[in-house]
Amino acid sequence: MAAEIILRLERIGRAYKEADRELIILNDADFTLRRGEMVALVAPSGAGKSTLLHTAGLLERPDSGDVVLDGRSCSKLSDDERTAVRRNDVGFVYQFHHLLPEFSALENVMLPQMIRGLSRKAAAERAQQLLEYMKIGKRASHRPAELSGGEQQRVAIARAVANAPLVLLADEPTGNLDPTTSSYVFGALEALVRQSGLAALIATHNHELARRMDRRVTLKDGRVVDL
């Protein structure tokens, strides 16, 4: 029996104005992501990977079509409602970690939980658990500048899943790391996804990492197609 569909993109259209012409990025794009599934999004720069991720994660509104998250249509949600859904159900990881430099690793992972309303004590406990799982628990008190690139990215991953999202969207999460560190960080990410059962869509240029996922897709003529 197939796993439950967590994320569904239905005939997504997205275009941008460029000088005197319209640049079509997504054109009736369809895509489904199931619980516990890891999907690699492999496409050249400029193909629309970031646009697809931002649309799927409710950071951008599509010009047409619908994003359905856990059975809920998001096309008619207000900006505040989209923000609430994004905060509760979607985790983001980027190529650059975007950690807050003035806070420790532990505090960076605590913050999204406290914004959601968790107590400081409960947030600290979960943050420490996640850092331990990412094998960086002993560095919890260190600020980002005191961590290596791989350590910073593992903190960013822990932060992304701190609120137990349904979906993890990652845009080149290991793209700024050397091959050995990249493989190690991806292994930690993969273990976390498998253990938690969330669904993950990961954009990457790294074909070796892409082959470690459940399936691979690309963008062709504005549509999502299997590789």
From Swiss-Prot:
GO terms for cellular component: plasma membrane. It comes from the Bacteria. Residues 7-227 form the ABC transporter domain. GO terms for biological process: lipoprotein localization to outer membrane; protein localization to outer membrane. Keywords: ATP-binding, Cell inner membrane, Cell membrane, Membrane, Nucleotide-binding, Translocase, Transport. InterPro entries: AAA+_ATPase, ABC_transporter-like_ATP-bd, ABC_transporter-like_CS, ABC_transpr_LolD-like, MacB-like_ATP-bd, P-loop_NTPase. It is a peripheral membrane protein. ATP binds at A43, P44, S45, G46, A47, G48, K49, S50. GO terms for molecular function: ATP binding; ATP hydrolysis activity; transmembrane transporter activity. The complex is composed of two ATP-binding proteins (LolD) and two transmembrane proteins (LolC and LolE). Part of the ABC transporter complex LolCDE involved in the translocation of mature outer membrane-directed lipoproteins, from the inner membrane to the periplasmic chaperone, LolA. Responsible for the formation of the LolA-lipoprotein complex in an ATP-dependent manner. This is Lipoprotein-releasing system ATP-binding protein LolD. It comes from Brucella abortus (strain 2308). The gene is lolD.
